[in-house]
């Protein structure tokens, strides 16, 4: 029995995601990508065997693959059940099927909100209700062979994420990460930041000639920035605030929190504080914590640091 389990574990996993248009397949795919799946949207079923051949070549990034297939490719979709049955019978990879659905009323509501055309009604010749009914009837067979059926009628996005995480994060992989970035306001704000802190009120090493060409990574600059009382008070408050906020962000289903610390040029003060913050957060949590000094190299000439 142990031998059989090892054989199963060694196989790559293929998850086919299909279901009703507007039920949330794209969101499911995003959540699976966060769990380490290699995701492909709208692959014609006839290409599934070719994709499995790629998976069998041993590429580590293709150990877990999720492929969304739906009625957008109507002429190809009819072969989906046949292709899935064939792959399952060959037993080359683990093949699962997820079917995502929602009630007619909820689907109608979502289409009205997005103002998008249903894939079976792109010419506007039929009612939305008729298009939904035809699609549901067309998907009866593929639904019958699904391992997982998820009804998103009453699910909020974070609840759907939690359900996907429960089903497919089998190894309890920690998917939450924290990225701490230093930047200079004169070079533009960090666009992807969730939280931005302005430290231009702190004493500036730029005006100390010996420190000017260095960065906050250098010990001389780091010690200069940290020696001031206002820096110590600010940093203690910042760390307390973040330790209060971070669990809440994770609970809400975020997979990455980007914290940006900015000073004038992004070379001295923000770098020193980002460096310390990343170190302290790394000690406090089991999450992956990264530090990135975006602008430190621009005026100092040092290489941009990512860790």
Swiss-Prot record:
Molecular-function GO term, any one: GTP binding
Residues the entry annotates as binding GTP: 70-73
Pfam families: PapZ_C, RapZ-like_N
Binding sites annotated in the UniProt record for ATP: 19-26
Record bears the keyword Zinc: no
Keywords: ATP-binding, GTP-binding, Nucleotide-binding
Signal peptide: none
NCBIfam families noted in UniProt: PRK05416.1
Role description: Displays ATPase and GTPase activities.
Family: Belongs to the RapZ-like family.
Family annotation (PANTHER family): RNASE ADAPTER PROTEIN RAPZ
Full protein name: Nucleotide-binding protein Sca_0414
Biological source species: Staphylococcus carnosus (strain TM300)
Origin organism lineage: Bacteria, Bacillati, Bacillota, Bacilli, Bacillales
């Amino acid at each position: 029995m142990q031998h059989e389990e090892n054989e199963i574990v060694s196989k790559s996993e293929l998850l086919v995601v299909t279901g009703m248009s507007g039920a949330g397949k794209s969101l499911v795919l995003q959540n699976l990508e966060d769990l380490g799946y290699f995701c492909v949207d709208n692959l014609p079923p006839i290409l599934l065997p070719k994709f499995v051949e790629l998976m069998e070549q041993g590429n580590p990034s293709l150990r877990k693959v999720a492929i969304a297939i739906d009625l957008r490719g109507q002429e190809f979709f009819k072969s989906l059940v046949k292709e899935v049955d064939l792959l399952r019978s060959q037993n080359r990879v683990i093949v699962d099927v997820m079917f995502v659905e929602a009630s007619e009323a909820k689907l109608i509501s979502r289409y009205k909100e997005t103002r998008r055309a249903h894939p079976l009604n792109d010419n506007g010749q039929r009612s939305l209700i008729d298009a939904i009914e035809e699609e549901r009837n067309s998907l009866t067979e593929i639904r019958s062979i699904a391992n997982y059926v998820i009804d998103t009628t009453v699910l909020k996005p974070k609840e759907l994420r939690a359900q996907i995480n429960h089903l497919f994060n089998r190894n309890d992989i920690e998917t939450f990460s924290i990225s701490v970035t230093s930047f200079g306001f004169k070079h533009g704000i960090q666009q992807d930041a969730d939280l931005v802190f302005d430290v231009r009120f702190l004493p500036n090493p730029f005006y100390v000639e010996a420190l000017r060409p260095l960065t906050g990574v250098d010990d001389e600059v780091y010690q200069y920035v940290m020696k001031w009382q206002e820096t110590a008070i600010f940093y203690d408050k910042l760390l307390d605030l973040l330790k209060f906020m971070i669990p809440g962000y994770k609970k809400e289903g975020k997979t990455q929190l980007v914290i940006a610390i900015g000073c004038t040029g992004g070379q001295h003060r923000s770098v020193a504080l980002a460096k310390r913050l990343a170190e302290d957060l790394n000690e406090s949590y089991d999450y992956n914590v990264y530090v990135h000094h975006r602008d430190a190299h621009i005026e100092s000439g040092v290489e941009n640091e990512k860790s």
